[in-house]
């Protein structure tokens, strides 16, 4: 399958210029069309009024009952000679032409090609193309006339109840047509010039209107990794850009938070690894500074092995968290009885709990949940290890399990010194410790709770912590 070549969308300036110019030019042409149509209707009304005046004058002559036909025609010719740009034809009741304008063809010969006049408002008015002839124009001299507006009407004395004549009157409209054509040409030329001006003005206006966008772009370009605390002021941009600026501020805030976490994380991991490496180097240098017995060398090796094991666990935990960060932590789910899983964790920590004089107790139902058994046991182990670390001798750690509204809630509760409220939101951060001075006194690597959160989130659940004088409670909620 051949992929289509990438086609970059038109710029905003181009699109805005096109649509605004198109709308403006369309409006101008609509105005021009209305003007031309109005002029046509006005000329049609003017011509019809002229035709009606002429027909009324001729009717008075032709309707006179006491005149002979010869007398009527003589009077008709005298009247017609006073009109310019008008052709007359008179037919009797048998359809024979008894009179037509002298020096001109009989217009009745052209009536078969007549078409109704759409611009005429009311009445039977027709348009004729022909005859073509030279006649006086509205100015000086003569001009060619070939387009006519015509009416016909019965006139003359009544015979058997019907007029004896049919009168045809045609008025030249060439001057009006020439005027309309000139007007259209001028409007087209004006429209062309105006269109060019509109495009230029719109381009200039769009360029000017995009100035705030360019200003915002320059401000964004000036932000570097050292300026992540900089925020754009939404009050200094047009309202259309306010949401964009707010979204950018939110994004840069998240980037700053991630960048800060990453920097702190790098510093913390360097510190965590530096200490055991320093211990290894120091112990090895001491061992090599003089001859040692086999027992002393074995003690050094065992101590080094302990530090290396701790470092290996830390690296494993960090790889686990890296998978979680990249959404690569995919649980292999199956139906589990959480009571059984808690029991397995209790078996693992039973000896340590006895040494510390702490009792482990499970309270609740046999909650069923779909989850990865290894991951969930690891999360429970981290919470229980944390609880054992801070529970006074003679106290009891309680793990509760219950199902509420299709959700499984697991609570690990231990008595002890309450945690200050300002520390609670950060307990699940990597390497965060409430008391930094205790970090090298067997207090773990500081990422156990971060692993708990990653596992719970991978199971589409949530984890929270509360602490007061009665103790500290970690609550995991998972979908049943």
UniProtKB/Swiss-Prot annotation:
Domain HAMP: 207-260
Residue ranges constituting the Histidine kinase domain according to the UniProt record: 268-480
A Pfam cross-reference name: HisKA
GO cellular component: plasma membrane
Enzyme class: transferase
InterPro entries documented for this protein: CusS-like_sensor, CztS_silS_copS, HAMP_dom, HATPase_C_sf, His_kinase_dom, HisK_dim/P_dom, HisK_dim/P_sf, Sig_transdc_His_kin-like_C
Modified residues annotated as Phosphohistidine in this record: 271
Residues in the Cytoplasmic compartment per record: 1-15, 208-480
Keywords in alphabetical order: ATP-binding, Cell inner membrane, Cell membrane, Copper, Kinase, Membrane, Nucleotide-binding, Phosphoprotein, Transferase, Transmembrane, Transmembrane helix, Two-component regulatory system
Catalytic activity: ATP + protein L-histidine = ADP + protein N-phospho-L-histidine
Source species, domain of life: Bacteria
Periplasmic side: 37-186
Cellular localisation: Cell inner membrane
PROSITE patterns found in the cross-reference section: HAMP, HIS_KIN
Bilayer topology annotation: Multi-pass membrane protein
Primary localisation category: membrane
Molecular function GO labels: ATP binding; phosphorelay sensor kinase activity
Entry comment on modification after translation: Autophosphorylated.
Record-annotated membrane-spanning stretches: 16-36, 187-207
EC number(s) stated in the UniProt entry for this protein: 2.7.13.3
Described function: Member of the two-component regulatory system CusS/CusR involved in response to copper and silver. Acts as a copper/silver ion sensor. Activates CusR by phosphorylation.
Protein name as annotated: Sensor histidine kinase CusS
Organism: Escherichia coli O6:H1 (strain CFT073 / ATCC 700928 / UPEC)
Gene: cusS
């Amino acid at each position: 399958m051949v992929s289509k070549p990438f086609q970059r969308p038109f710029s905003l300036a181009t699109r805005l210029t096109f649509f605004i110019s198109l709308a403006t030019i369309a409006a101008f042409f609509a105005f021009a069309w209305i003007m031309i149509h109005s002029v046509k209707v006005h000329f049609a009304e003017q011509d019809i009024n002229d035709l009606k005046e002429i027909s009324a004058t001729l009717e008075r002559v032709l309707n006179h009952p006491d005149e002979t036909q010869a007398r009527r025609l003589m009077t008709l010719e005298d009247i017609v000679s006073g009109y310019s740009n008008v052709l007359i034809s008179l037919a009797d009741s048998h359809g024979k032409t008894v009179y037509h304008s002298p020096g001109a063809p009989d217009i009745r010969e052209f009536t078969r090609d007549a078409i109704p006049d759409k611009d005429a408002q009311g009445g039977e008015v027709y348009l004729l193309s022909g005859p073509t002839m030279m006649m006086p124009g509205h100015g000086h001299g003569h001009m060619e006339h070939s387009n006519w507006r015509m009416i016909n009407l019965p006139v003359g004395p009544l015979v058997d109840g019907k007029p004896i004549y049919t009168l045809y009157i045609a008025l030249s409209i060439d001057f009006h047509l020439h005027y309309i054509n000139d007007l259209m040409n001028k409007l087209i030329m004006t429209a062309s010039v105006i269109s060019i001006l509109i495009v230029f003005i719109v381009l200039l206006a769009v360029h000017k209107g995009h100035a705030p966008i360019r200003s915002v772009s320059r401000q964004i370009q000036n932000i570097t990794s050292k300026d992540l605390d900089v925020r754009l002021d939404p009050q200094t941009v047009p309202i259309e850009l306010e949401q964009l600026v707010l979204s950018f501020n939110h994004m840069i805030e998240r980037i700053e938070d991630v960048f800060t976490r990453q920097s702190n994380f790098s510093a913390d991991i360097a510190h965590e690894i530096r200490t055991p490496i320093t211990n290894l180097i120091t112990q090895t240098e001491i061992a090599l500074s003089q001859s040692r017995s086999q027992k002393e060398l074995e003690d050094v090796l065992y101590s080094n092995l302990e530090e290396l094991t701790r470092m290996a666990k830390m690296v494993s935990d960090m790889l686990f968290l890296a998978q979680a960060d990249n959404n690569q932590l995919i649980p292999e789910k199956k139906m589990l009885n959480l009571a059984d899983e808690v029991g397995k964790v209790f078996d693992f920590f039973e000896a340590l709990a006895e040494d510390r004089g702490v009792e482990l107790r499970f309270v609740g139902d046999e909650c069923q949940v779909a989850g990865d058994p290894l991951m969930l046991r690891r999360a429970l182990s981290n919470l229980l290890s944390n609880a054992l670390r801070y529970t006074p001798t003679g106290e009891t750690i309680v793990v509760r399990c219950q199902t509420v509204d299709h959700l499984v809630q697991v609570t690990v509760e231990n008595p002890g010194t309450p945690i200050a409220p300002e520390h609670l939101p950060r307990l699940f951060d990597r390497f965060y410790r409430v008391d930094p001075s205790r970090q090298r006194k067997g207090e773990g690597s500081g990422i156990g709770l971060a692993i708990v959160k990653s596992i719970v989130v991978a199971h589409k659940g949530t984890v929270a912590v509360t602490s007061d004088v009665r103790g500290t409670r970690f609550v995991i909620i998972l979908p049943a």
